[in-house]
């Protein structure tokens, strides 16, 4: 597990009028420069980031009297317990996960309320996230926190934080945090204002903690004013549709980053290592069958792994068939550069005790119909083992590796990693392009 970096609070969240945000922050730094006490404090000059954090799940659960914790967007034990309770009430499988069926039932229950209750839960959106991002030394964090109240005007808070990496630091590099709260309708009206809060001359990022919505005015304004739109496809209830939207955005020269992509790193590295020995390199070109098992509920990681290996080996999508069933099977065919056919199967495996992220890879197998090809490779998660893939044939002649689970795969931790990367990720974009071509050929059984 990663150790949290302690933060010094220069200014606790302070309510302020929208028109006074810049003046207030300027005064904060002026006061620090003239205080003459303690370590030298200065504002970071790195990047600005907007975080759009709707967090409807916790708000609706709270409105229905099922959740009494903080609104923080982190989906900890209290949130999962409330979701499980709601699922039981709605007659849905009690997983504690925020899936699309649960969201639909919650929205219907909320809309059926005669009066929308005022929430008493402490709203920590913005504050909690600012602590996570502050360790990456941003210059300014702007958190957008829509509320369920249909007519709540926009309110603002400003604060400042300094990460402490050493007990004897002579200087501190600090960041500003601006949190805006209000109804969704009011949020739609301040897109230009939010864009102006992003400091000129520095990289600008937007973490959109929801599905991409190119038709939404706020989304459009932020996408046009930033260098990169960041998402996490593990949130998506229909990642296939959202991946097509991703590709459309990239085609329009919008730089996209998906935090879920980083969760594949160990699987990609072990795949590459399996074919690194000289005697196996030719075998890689003989691969014509790929089976991927993932935790049922979100095929995003499976699709991205498929797109990654297809883009590396020059496979072109030919067909994409959704068969459904217990394992939500998808059968995809590719054609290689030497005109051979490759069959790919994606299987969603029901898991009794799922991990932190919906849709994590469980296992995969690369094989060939050529019995002389040295390419059979099985990768499987340490937590589930390789039994199903080994039962699929050829365990004795396969190279088998276990993938250690990541030490920390929360969205917040991966965001910190993403902030250390500057520039476009060509490997991701090439993989997504293959996925998009395949998805546009999708048919259903």
Swiss-Prot record:
Disulfide bond entries: none
Coiled coil regions in record: none
One Pfam family recorded for the sequence: PG_binding_1
Functional summary from the UniProt entry: May be involved in the functional assembly of glucose 6-phosphate dehydrogenase.
Protein's recorded name: Putative OxPP cycle protein OpcA
Species per Swiss-Prot/TrEMBL record: Synechococcus elongatus (strain ATCC 33912 / PCC 7942 / FACHB-805) (Anacystis nidulans R2)
Name of the coding gene: opcA
């Amino acid at each position: 597990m990663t150790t949290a970096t302690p933060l010094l609070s220069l200014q606790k969240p302070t309510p302020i009028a929208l028109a006074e945000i810049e003046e207030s922050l300027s005064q904060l730094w002026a006061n620090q420069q003239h205080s003459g006490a303690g370590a030298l404090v200065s504002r970071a000059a790195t990047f600005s980031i907007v975080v759009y954090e709707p967090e409807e799940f916790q708000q609706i659960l709270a409105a229905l009297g099922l959740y009494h914790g903080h609104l923080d967007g982190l989906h900890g034990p209290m949130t999962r317990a409330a979701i499980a309770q709601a699922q039981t009430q709605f007659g849905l499988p009690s997983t504690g996960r925020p899936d699309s069926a649960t969201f639909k039932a919650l929205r219907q229950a909320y809309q059926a309320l005669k009066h929308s209750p005022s929430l008493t839960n402490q709203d920590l959106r913005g504050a909690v996230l600012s602590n996570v991002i502050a360790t990456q030394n941003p210059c300014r964090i702007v958190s957008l926190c829509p509320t369920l109240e249909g007519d709540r005007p926009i309110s603002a808070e400003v604060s400042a934080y300094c990460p402490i990496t050493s007990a004897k630091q002579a200087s501190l590099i600090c960041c500003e945090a601006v949190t805006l709260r209000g109804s969704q309708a009011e949020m739609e009206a301040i897109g230009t204002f939010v864009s102006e809060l992003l400091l000129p001359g520095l990289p600008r990022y937007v973490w959109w903690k929801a599905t991409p919505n190119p038709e939404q005015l706020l989304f459009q304004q932020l996408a046009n004013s930033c260098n990169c739109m960041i998402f996490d496809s593990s949130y998506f209830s229909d990642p296939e549709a959202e991946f097509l939207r991703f590709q459309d955005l990239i085609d329009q020269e919008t730089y996209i980053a998906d935090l879920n992509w980083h969760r594949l790193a160990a699987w990609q590295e072990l795949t590459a290592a399996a074919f690194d020995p000289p005697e196996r390199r030719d075998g890689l070109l003989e691969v014509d069958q790929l089976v991927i098992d993932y935790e049922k509920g979100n095929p995003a990681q499976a699709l991205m792994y498929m797109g990654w290996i297809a883009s590396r080996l020059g496979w072109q999508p030919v067909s994409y068939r959704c068969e459904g069933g217990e394992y939500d099977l998808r059968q995809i065919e590719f054609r290689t550069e030497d005109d051979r056919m490759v069959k790919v199967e994606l299987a969603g495996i029901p898991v009794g005790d799922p991990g932190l992220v919906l849709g994590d890879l469980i296992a995969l197998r690369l094989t060939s119909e050529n019995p002389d090809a040295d390419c059979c490779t099985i990768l499987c998660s340490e937590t589930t083992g390789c039994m199903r893939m080994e039962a699929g044939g050829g365990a004795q002649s396969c190279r088998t590796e276990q993938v250690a689970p990541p030490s920390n795969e929360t969205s917040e931790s991966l965001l910190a990693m993403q902030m250390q990367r500057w520039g476009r990720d060509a490997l991701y974009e090439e993989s997504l392009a293959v996925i998009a071509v395949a998805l546009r050929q999708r048919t259903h059984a």
